[in-house]
Amino acid sequence: MFDKLQSIKEKHLDLEQQLADPSAASDQNRFRKLNKEYSDLKEIVHAFDRYSLARKQLEESRELLGSEKDPQMRELVQMEIEDLQEKLPELEQQLKVLLLPKDEADSRNVIMEIRAGTGGDEAALFAADLLRMYQRYAERQGWKCVLLDYTESSVPGGFREVTLEVSGHDVFATMKYESGVHRVQRVPDTETQGRIHTSAASVAVLPEAEEVDVEIRRDDLRFDTYRSGGKGGQNVNKVETAVRITHLPTGIVAACQEERSQLQNKERAMTMLRTKLYDIQLAEQQQQRADLRRSMVSTGDRSAKIRTYNYPQSRVTDHRIGFTSHALPQIMQGEIGDVIEALKLHDQTARLQAEQV
């Protein structure tokens, strides 16, 4: 492991020198690639520096303890040694986690799709609740959220389907754990007998594709335009600015109605279509590693019930790892960091175990 870390440190230094060369900025694509590679290695290098420093301090403290005669000084040195001996395994574990193979899509922005499932109007309202939860979480993270497309339900405030783009630092690395079926248990406002109803909504988190990721033939596309709808379903535009694109070989559809011009909506819809096709490619690649991924947190099986939101008990349970929180109101306000961190930790632990097999 330490030979690999030393090699990474040398690579990081080489990248730093390349980026410092004034000629590097002349090729923007190459510069961005170098800068991303440099940034990806920075955290590992800094962690390795902390580990190396702690090891050096431990060696020096042991040498000092062997030569020191003063009892008080020896006691202080012994305390320093014990602190460092406790600190080193933690630093080594951090390095092992950082060295785990990264998902190539982790640094990407995402397209999120939220769909109401079983439960009628209550499911549509729950889909809207999930949308607000993710929007508030994104705001806390300093990410940008753009609502791309939506279909409202018959009940005011509900959605049958919502598509949004979330952009920022390492969005997919964080949000990929949210894919799956989310279940809610609560008493609807219209329930006069006080009975608890169970409803569901599905969430799909797709890493946003770049133009180079997927080759799409123009002949394989059908473009339709229509008037974008406002809240409540009324047509607020007199011109057909909304765009729907159908990929004929697969039947996959992408639509956008939120931008002001047809051209902007077309560009957004193409990004969504590329993302959906890219997701199919990724799924095919991930299938080849299915045996390994069975031991990991499921991040993509959208047929699996992953989480339950129980309102009467103010409880949120993630069924994949047995995580339970009784802070449901805060979670629905976007404070889902603890849930996601627990999923990340479980994922890392499983992957470390798989690496050691």
From Swiss-Prot:
Cellular location(s): Cytoplasm
Give the main location.
Answer: cytoplasm
Q: Which GO terms describe its cellular component?
A: cytoplasm
The UniProt record lists the keyword Cytoplasm: yes
Keyword Cytoplasm annotated: yes
What Gene3D superfamilies does the database record attribute to this sequence? Answer: 3.30.160.20, 3.30.70.1660, 6.10.140.1950
N5-methylglutamine: modified positions: 234
Q: Which Pfam families match?
A: PCRF, RF-1
According to its UniProt record, which protein family does this protein belong to?
Belongs to the prokaryotic/mitochondrial release factor family.
Q: What does this protein do?
A: Peptide chain release factor 1 directs the termination of translation in response to the peptide chain termination codons UAG and UAA.
Any idea what this protein is called? Peptide chain release factor 1
What organism does the UniProt record list as the source?
Chlorobium limicola (strain DSM 245 / NBRC 103803 / 6330)
Question: Which gene produces this protein?
Answer: prfA
